[in-house]
Amino acid sequence: MTRPLIISDCDEVLMHMVVPFAQWVDEAHGVVFQMEDASFANALKRKSCGTPLEAMEVWPLLDGFFTHEMHRQMPIAGAIDAMLRLSTAADIVILTNVGPDHQPRRVDQLAAHGLHFPVIGSRGGKGDPVAALIAERAPTLTVFIDDLAQHHHSVADAAPDVWRLHMVGEPAIADKVRPSRAAHARIDDWGAAEAWIADILRAGAPAPALTTA
């Protein structure tokens, strides 16, 4: 018998990312991370002169962080216990844009904190991977959780019946990120988020359509 499915991002939903990343690039690369709007790349500037990094300089830093520094990441408050409780009522898959190369490290990272769920290391928009998971698993309903608005738009296009929760669990940047118009709710606290998800699982209805234009 199929169950509901929760598809969750990891960074800034389950694990802190930008704060430990900022500490590392400061210490190891002389780069300051100061987020003034929703742009991640524009937040990275050289300490020596204040000029922003080019886009091609950002990806190697992210790759280096996920290769060597994931131990710096700690869970978002309440995330682990909430996911474990929700797993009694739904299947859970972690869909994280670290790419396939870092997928094994993400599996180990989450397992070290007690989360033993399937992990998919994707790249790009999450709509197609979400649609593929739904086709494979045929869940009774699906809830998608992510901190990035573009992924909610992608999922809304590819799988419109999915409930979409916009969550930015890092307090240092939450107020810099506008609520996604493609999400059914914006909740940055796991206590309230767990209650919202649990209500949806109990109701068992597909998500209503949203106007995202």
Predicted feature residues:
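Substrate-recognition "cap/lid" segment bordering the active-site pocket of phosphatases
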Residues: 99-143, 150-157
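N-terminal/domain-start segments enriched in small and hydrophobic, helix-friendly residues
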Residues: 41-72, 123-145, 192, 196
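Short acidic-hydrophobic, aromatic-tinged amphipathic segments that line or gate anion-handling sites
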Residues: 118-124, 184-192
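Acidic, Mg2+-coordinating phosphoryl-transfer loop and its flanking beta/alpha structural elements
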Residues: 144-188
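Short, charged, surface-exposed secondary-structure boundary motifs
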Residues: 128-131, 173-182, 196-198
